[in-house]
């Protein structure tokens, strides 16, 4: 049998899977396709890491490791749903929940006191941040808005805030002392094994990464961010923001850049509340407060103090706000600010939302205000300022007419910054950070750093670059759309890539294709001018811009990035099919618990499944899989045209109801097609059954709404309870079961 691996993840997509997967399995088995699940939720990953603490019955396999190996199989076919990129707070909450359910895993050591705790901290670190995607993404990224989705957005445009030319909103970034400012890069002339070390001022050497194997033609970079320059930057920007009377907002990606960005975030918090930290710093250290984890962790820790001392600290924190700018809010009604948690404001989602809102963010009074968007690292901050400039001059974009911006992203084999976590360090001393060839002793790259500076090494292998260029040319040819490589010749790393792109383009037939290389700001301006005229432009970018642009443009075009088609053609021949580019929607889960209404839109799952079946049809020469894929494609379009996507409002159609309509339309398409008589005969009775019982099924699905529910767990819900909640229509369940 052909096989599809369907991942079980977290939060809203995990709940949606309980409703949708039985439908997928029932339909797929008619084409000889076996659909298996693989649990890569944060709970499963934590448990897999500590088998020696568990009983035999409690142990779970390391599914992420197994899937990583599977990506090397030419027959791999994996559908990957969004998962939690856990912050420290989320990880600790998951650990606490698992311990409460009888799993005797160790506590998370905030400040490890011995070698054993260091090892526990290291092992838990594997589940922090974006730890899933780098393992599975053994290919480059092809993300685009399917035609049916784009057409729907044009006919049913989402709301867009109005931009004013006099808007004070702007982006602020460092102009010196950041990673861009001092980056060094080189392409290796041969395979080498290197180490990362810090040569201290007293002549001793501290080895930080003893052994890194590098390949011939690999691009390596060394860069650092100055702590001194960063703190001066924050002071300057906070004062400028206060004088301007606009909101201060900090935009980082602490989930992915899980070593560097929490540090960058923590420095902003300490500068903002500088007087309180100077007064209470010793006590905060004693309590083990680490504001790299946000103000939420500080408030949590001071609850242990006597009331008088706690109130004094709270007064001192509030007093700091008098001479600091107002903070942008994550949730005005609950008083949650931009500094609450580093994972609350994630740049690739927060910046597009602000731009879509006419350049405004929420203040503490629940009103919208202009803001200063602070992104310390200048490398990619400039693209957002370019878009803001464009919006101020031309006004907001029109979803009914704007063009689309598909992306071909370089990400395979942990390319660039997104693969640098294990090679990122906060310097413990002044000295020279360097990369040294172990065999020859040759110093390949070196930089002078000071205590507290963040320095890192990035790698980009040559095969992924060749594959990226090939994919860009293929997409240009298939879609007859210009491709722009967003590469800055003044950035050393990207200058190395430009040389390679120019070389590898010669390996392909580019006759009749429009392919250019532009710096990020020029590429953004060129793309926006085309978008405003309704023209399409493919962006070929590195790993970070892949992430940023595949949220930015879809949010403006479609209202969400969850409706993107996200395909990763694996370099060994298999396929990884990601369901959209959004997160795992904790607020959707909150609504389900409070009102038994799940507004998660599974369109991303429908699109990924279509591509997965298409891939299967080609790879396994499975004609029935092709019929299923074509029928699903038409059914998805019908679902959009008939407006059967989930409503945000309790009592109306939700995720479960949209799954019913998808199954109904899919069965009808299969019953109506003439390519395969066997499938036609199999699905005719189901189509009839769903048609006849439509009103009764929808009533059963909707009548359970409006009541609170308890799933007996968040990170590890009670499976029977959750399944019962997500499949509340006996009529629909029986109809799907009748297929097998």
Curated annotation (Swiss-Prot):
Binding-site residues, NADP(+): 83, 85, 133, 584, 588, 599, 601, 648
Enzyme class, broadest EC rank: oxidoreductase
Name of the protein in question: Isocitrate dehydrogenase [NADP] 2
Organism: Psychrobacter sp. (strain 13A)
Catalytically driven reaction(s): D-threo-isocitrate + NADP(+) = 2-oxoglutarate + CO2 + NADPH
Gene3D superfamilies named among the record's database cross-references: Isopropylmalate Dehydrogenase (3.40.718.10)
InterPro entries: Isocitrate_DH_NADP_mono
Subunit record text: Monomer.
Keywords for the protein's UniProt record, in alphabetical order: Glyoxylate bypass, Magnesium, Manganese, Metal-binding, NADP, Oxidoreductase, Tricarboxylic acid cycle
Residues binding Mg(2+), per UniProt: 348, 547, 551
Induction remark: Expression is weakly induced at 30 degrees Celsius, the optimum growth temperature of the strain 13A.
A Pfam family recorded for this sequence: IDH
Cofactor binding, per record: Binds 1 Mg(2+) or Mn(2+) ion per subunit. Mn(2+) is the most effective divalent cation in vitro, but the enzyme can also use Mg(2+), Co(2+) and Zn(2+), with lower efficiency.
GO MF, one annotated term: isocitrate dehydrogenase (NADP+) activity
Family, as annotated: Belongs to the monomeric-type IDH family.
Cofactor entry: Mg(2+); Mn(2+)
Noted pH dependence of activity: Optimum pH is 7.0.
Comment on activity versus temperature: Optimum temperature is 45 degrees Celsius. Retains about 60% of its maximum activity after incubation for 10 min at 40 degrees Celsius, but completely loses its activity by incubation at 50 degrees Celsius.
GO annotation terms (biological process): glyoxylate cycle; tricarboxylic acid cycle
EC annotation from Swiss-Prot or TrEMBL: 1.1.1.42
Primary role: Catalyzes the oxidative decarboxylation of isocitrate to 2-oxoglutarate and carbon dioxide with the concomitant reduction of NADP(+). Cannot use NAD(+).
Binding site for D-threo-isocitrate: 130, 133, 137, 143, 253, 418, 546
Stated regulation of activity: IDH activity is not significantly affected by monovalent cations. The combined addition of Mn(2+) and another divalent cation results in the decrease of the activity.
């Amino acid at each position: 049998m052909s096989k599809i691996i369907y991942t079980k993840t977290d939060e809203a997509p995990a709940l949606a899977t309980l409703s949708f997967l039985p439908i997928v399995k029932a339909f797929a088995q008619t084409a000889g396709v076996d659909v298996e699940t693989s649990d890569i939720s944060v709970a499963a990953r934590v448990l897999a890491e500590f088998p020696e603490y568990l009983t035999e019955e409690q142990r779970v396999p390391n599914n992420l490791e197994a899937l990583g190996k599977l990506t090397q199989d030419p027959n791999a076919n994996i559908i990957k749903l969004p998962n939690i990129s856990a912050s420290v707070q989320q990880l600790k909450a998951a650990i606490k929940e698992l311990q409460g359910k009888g799993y005797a895993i160790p506590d998370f050591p905030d400040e490890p006191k011995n070698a054993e705790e260091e090892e526990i901290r290291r092992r838990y670190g594997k589940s922090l941040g974006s730890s899933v995607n780098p393992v599975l993404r053994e290919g480059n990224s092809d993300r685009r808005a399917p035609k049916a989705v784009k057409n729907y957005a044009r006919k049913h445009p989402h709301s867009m805030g109005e931009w004013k030319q006099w808007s004070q909103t702007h982006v602020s970034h460092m102009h010196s002392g950041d990673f861009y400012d001092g980056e060094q890069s080189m392409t290796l002339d041969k395979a080498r094994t290197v180490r990362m070390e810090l040569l201290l001022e007293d002549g001793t050497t501290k080895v930080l990464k003893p052994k890194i194997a590098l390949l011939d033609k690999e691009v390596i970079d060394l860069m650092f961010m100055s702590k001194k320059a960063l703190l001066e930057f924050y002071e300057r920007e906070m004062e400028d923001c206060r004088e301007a009377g606009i909101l201060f907002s900090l935009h980082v990606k602490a989930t992915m850049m899980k070593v560097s960005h929490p540090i960058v975030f923590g420095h902003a918090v300490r500068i903002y509340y500088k007087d309180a930290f100077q007064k209470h710093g010793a006590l905060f250290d004693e309590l083990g407060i680490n504001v790299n984890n946000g103000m939420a962790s500080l408030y949590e820790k001071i609850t242990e103090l006597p009331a008088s001392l706690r109130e004094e600290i709270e007064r001192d924190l509030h007093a700091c706000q008098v001479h600091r700018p107002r903070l942008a809010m994550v949730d005005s009604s609950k008083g949650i600010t931009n500094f609450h948690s580093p994972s609350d404001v994630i740049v690739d989602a927060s910046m597009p939302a602000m731009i879509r809102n006419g350049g405004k963010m929420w203040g503490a009074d629940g009103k919208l205000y202009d803001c200063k968007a602070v992104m310390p690292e200048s490398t990619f901050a400039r693209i957002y300022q370019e878009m803001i400039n464009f919006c101020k001059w031309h006004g907001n974009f029109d979803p009914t007419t704007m063009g689309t911006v598909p992306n071909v992203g370089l990400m395979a084999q942990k390319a660039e910054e997104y693969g640098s976590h294990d090679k990122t360090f906060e310097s413990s001393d002044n000295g020279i950070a360097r990369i040294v060839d172990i065999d020859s002793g040759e110093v390949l790259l070196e930089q002078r750093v000071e205590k507290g500076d963040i320095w890192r090494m990035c790698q980009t292998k040559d095969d992924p670059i060749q594959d990226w260029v090939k994919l860009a040319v293929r997409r240009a040819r298939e879609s007859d759309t210009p491709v722009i490589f967003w590469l800055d010749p003044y950035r050393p790393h990207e200058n190395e890539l430009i040389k390679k792109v120019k070389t590898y383009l010669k390996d392909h037939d580019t006759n009749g294709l429009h392919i250019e290389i532009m710096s990020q700001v020029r590429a953004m301006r060129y793309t926006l001018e085309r978008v405003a005229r309704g023209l399409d432009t493919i962006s070929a970018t590195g790993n970070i811009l892949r992430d940023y642009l595949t949220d930015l443009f879809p949010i403006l075009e479609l209202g969400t990035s969850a409706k993107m088609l996200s395909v990763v053609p694996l370099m060994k021949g298999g396929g990884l099919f990601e369901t959209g580019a959004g997160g795992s929607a904790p607020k959707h889960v909150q609504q389900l618990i409070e009102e038994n209404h799940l507004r998660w839109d599974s369109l991303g799952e429908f699109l990924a499944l279509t591509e997965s079946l298409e891939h299967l049809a080609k790879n396994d020469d499975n004609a029935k899989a092709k019929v299923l894929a074509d029928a699903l494609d038409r059914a998805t379009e019908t679902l959009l045209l008939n407006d059967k996507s989930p409503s945000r409002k309790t009592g109306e159609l939700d995720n479960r109801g949209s799954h019913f309509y998808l199954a109904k339309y899919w069965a009808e398409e299969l019953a109506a097609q003439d390519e395969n008589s066997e499938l036609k005969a199999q699905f005719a009775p189901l189509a009839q059954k769903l048609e006849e019982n439509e009103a009764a099924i929808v009533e059963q699905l909707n009548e359970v709404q409006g009541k609170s529910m308890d799933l007996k767990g968040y990170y590890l819900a009670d499976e029977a309870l959750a399944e019962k909640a997500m499949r509340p229509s006996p009529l629909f369940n029986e109809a799907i079961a009748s297929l097998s």
